[in-house]
């Protein structure tokens, strides 16, 4: 209840800004770039493709740490593929939960950021995060069919950022902590997945996050 109350208090501190002067700064450039690089998760991704059920989604050139374990080596090929699906689903579930957290933070910033440019940028980023939530959820639901709950450590981190009263630290928390960590994980999975749909999906998400 305390966490919920603190989060709702953010909306009591929304900041109107009646100065609509457009400053030619980095935030304005990021907003313009976001408009130029817009994409539609429903039509720009090849959802008709489904990775073969007898092939792994993730198979890097180098051996993954768990592949050296005797317990893993004792699995049948079918069990290894099932392990791959669960392992990928767990990772992508955390992506999904993290992007929902980023969506909530960005929407808060659109309300409480003090400048006109910052509000526009936060609004555009809110749409980016909504799109990421959409495509990660659709891939998990339609292509893997497995979903994992949020990691408690990730939930704690998101709660800290969501309930902080300071808009500037909220902005830093989203850009450096949430998005910074996510970008590295997205790039890693993009590099090692054998699923062209997942690779295409991550290409667009990484492009958004790297702006």
Regions found by a protein language model. Give the residues of each.
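Alpha-helical scaffold segments that form or flank carboxylate-/histidine-based iron centers
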Residues: 85-95, 114-131, 167-171, 196-210
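Helix-loop segments that flank and shape redox-cofactor active sites
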Residues: 16, 22, 78-82, 102-121, ...
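Long, hydrophobic, well-ordered secondary-structure blocks that form the structural core
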Residues: 102-163
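Acidic/His metal-coordination segments adjacent to aromatic residues that form catalytic metal sites
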Residues: 70-94, 152-176, 192-193
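Long, hydrophobic/aromatic-enriched structural stretches that serve as scaffold segments
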Residues: 62-117
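Single conserved hydrophobic/aromatic residue that forms the stacking wall/gate
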Residues: 1-7, 11
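Alpha-helical transition-metal enzyme core signature, strongest for iron centers
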Residues: 95-103, 125-140, 172-186, 205-210
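Conserved alpha-helical segments that form or flank metal/cofactor-binding pockets of metalloenzymes
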Residues: 27-29, 33-64, 126-149
């Amino acid at each position: 209840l305390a966490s919920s109350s603190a989060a709702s208090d953010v909306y009591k501190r929304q900041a109107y800004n009646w100065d609509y002067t457009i400053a030619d700064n980095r935030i304005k450039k990021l907003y313009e770039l976001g408009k130029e690089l817009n994409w539609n998760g429903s039509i720009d991704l090849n959802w008709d493709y489904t990775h073969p059920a007898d092939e792994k989604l993730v198979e890097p050139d180098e051996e993954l740490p768990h592949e050296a374990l005797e317990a893993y080596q004792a699995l049948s090929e079918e069990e290894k593929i099932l392990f791959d699906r669960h392992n990928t689903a767990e990772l992508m579930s955390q992506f999904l939960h993290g992007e929902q957290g980023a969506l909530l933070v960005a929407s808060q910033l659109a309300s409480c950021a003090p400048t006109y440019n910052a509000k526009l940028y936060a609004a555009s980023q809110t749409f980016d995060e909504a799109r990421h939530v959409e495509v990660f959820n659709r891939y998990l639901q339609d292509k893997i069919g497995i979903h994992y709950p949020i990691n408690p450590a990730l939930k704690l981190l998101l709660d800290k950022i969501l309930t902080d009263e300071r808009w500037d630290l909220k902005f830093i928390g989203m850009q450096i902590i949430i998005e910074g960590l996510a970008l590295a994980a997205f790039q890693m999975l993009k590099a090692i997945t054998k699923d062209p749909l997942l690779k295409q999906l991550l290409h667009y998400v990484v492009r958004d996050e790297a702006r």
